């Protein structure tokens, strides 16, 4: 049986090679070998996804490559989700996070990864999906009273809608009851500061760490 480092390296390769079948196989192998699922995701699948993201940013890869890598990661995570859920039931809930891709944006790659990582970290995640209307974010905040509401935007044209979340939460009188987080390829710390968001998640790992810090948990 392969050692932990070898399994993690294979997990990373399955993403950079856009291989769904390999990702699922590696996940099975990792579970059988007793590899920590969180470590497998962080150092294997997510590391591979971040490498693909960097190459996409440099113009070496294109959107279909990123989507294929995301599908591979999804295949791997699906295999280890039951084990994660089993562990999660034995730990306390750190809080509720509502997450969705902003109105007008049909891409869900980054959002899906952040949602998975937050779930694994011990948060209850309510995933609203993609192309989510601003009013839906606001309605869900009022209904579910989460600790964090997060929006992802993968295009500069949809990024501006993140301002609307801030404004409509204020209009609804609930802005001070929830932390807001923004992320996505064109989003920056400067943008988060400009619109008044509480948290900027640069990557999935960064998002989890910052949510924990903001809520003083974990």
From Swiss-Prot:
Residues annotated as coiled-coil are none
Q: What does this protein do?
A: Acts probably as a methyl group carrier between MttB and either MtbA or MtaA.
Pathway given for this chain reads:
One-carbon metabolism; methanogenesis from trimethylamine
- Its Gene Ontology biological processes? homocysteine metabolic process; methanogenesis; tetrahydrofolate metabolic process
CC annotations in GO: cytosol
Q: Which gene encodes it?
A: mttC2
Q: Which UniProt keywords apply?
A: Cobalt, Metal-binding, Methanogenesis, Repeat
How it assembles, according to the record, is: Can form a complex with MttB.
Segments forming domain B12-binding N-terminal: 1-92
* Species of origin: Methanosarcina mazei (strain ATCC BAA-159 / DSM 3647 / Goe1 / Go1 / JCM 11833 / OCM 88)
Give start-end of the signal peptide: none
- Cite the GO molecular-function annotations of the record: cobalamin binding; cobalt ion binding; methionine synthase activity
Which family does this protein fall into?
Answer: Belongs to the methylamine corrinoid protein family.
Superkingdom of this protein's organism: Archaea
Record-linked NCBIfam families: pyl_corrinoid
Q: Does the keyword Lipid metabolism apply?
A: no
Query: What InterPro entries would the database entry show?
Result: Cbl-bd_cap, Cobalamin-bd, Cobalamin-bd_sf, Corrinoid_p, Met_Synthase/Corrinoid, Meth_synthase_dom
The protein here is known as Trimethylamine corrinoid protein 2
Provide the residue positions that the database annotates as binding methylcob(III)alamin.
107
Q: The B12-binding domain covers which part of the protein?
A: 94-218
């Amino acid at each position: 049986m392969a050692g932990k480092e070898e399994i993690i390296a294979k997990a990373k390769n399955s993403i950079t090679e856009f291989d769904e079948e390999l990702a699922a196989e590696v996940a099975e192998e990792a579970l059988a070998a007793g590899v920590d699922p969180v470590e497998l995701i962080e150092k294997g699948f997510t590391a591979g996804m971040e490498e693909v993201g960097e190459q996409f940013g440099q113009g070496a890869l294109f959107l279909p490559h990123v989507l294929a890598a995301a599908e591979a990661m999804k295949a791997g995570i699906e295999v280890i989700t039951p084990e994660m859920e089993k562990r999660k039931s034995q730990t306390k809930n750190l809080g509720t996070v509502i997450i969705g891709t902003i109105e007008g944006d049909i891409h869900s790659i980054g959002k899906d990864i952040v949602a998975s990582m937050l779930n694994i970290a011990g948060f209850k995640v309510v995933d609203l999906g993609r192309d989510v209307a601003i009013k839906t974010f606001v309605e869900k905040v009022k209904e579910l009273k989460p600790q964090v509401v997060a929006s992802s935007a993968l295009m500069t044209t949809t990024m501006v809608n993140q301002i609307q979340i801030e404004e409509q939460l204020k209009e609804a009188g609930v802005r001070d009851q929830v932390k807001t987080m923004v992320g996505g390829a064109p989003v920056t710390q400067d943008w988060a500061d400009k619109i008044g968001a509480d948290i900027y998640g640069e990557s999935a790992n960064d998002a989890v760490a910052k949510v924990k810090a903001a809520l003083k948990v974990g």
